[in-house]
């Protein structure tokens, strides 16, 4: 992508994105094209595919839960075409790295609502908590411990007592206790990972 087109695309995207400057958007576009290939190159892919994205989540942001990583991919891939476009990449990273609490609540709820029905069900909580907990060899029935955690989560967060969490339930619980934002599994990067990623993206990519 030539400099003029890059600046044009960065300018258009930076109008949509509130958490990155125009030069930062330029760097993220450059990084995107190193991942998928240059426009016009016959080997260039349609976008960032699921495997490439999972490698980024694992190697750069330290995520290990396959189910959560798959849901994060779906959160970025707004049009559900199985590829992350350059716009989806920059918009997704804006919330992922620097979102407001409200944006992060919306994002995390979308990750945890595994079947997309607008609720985090008892079964979904069970699957996510089971995946995120280390199994103790001494436990006779590890599922019992997970079931207990699900009940604790519902008791604390299910304000309308319908045995599932609506967005309103989740939002209210997190606003009252911010630590509940990632109650069902890590789906946001920590500050150390963010700094390392931005150092690479905003410093090293400018040298390319």
Curated annotation (Swiss-Prot):
The keyword Calcium applies. This is Calaxin. GO terms for biological process: cilium movement; outer dynein arm assembly; regulation of cilium movement; regulation of flagellated sperm motility; regulation of signal transduction. It comes from the Eukaryota. Ca(2+) 1 binds at residues 77, 79, 81. Ca(2+) 2 binds at residues 113, 115, 117, 119, 124. GO terms for molecular function: calcium ion binding. It comes from Xenopus laevis. Component of the outer dynein arm-docking complex along with ODAD1, ODAD2, ODAD3 and ODAD4. Residues 64-99, 100-135, 145-180 form the EF-hand domain. It is found in: Cytoplasm, Cytoskeleton, Cilium axoneme; Cell projection, Cilium; Cell projection, Cilium, Flagellum.
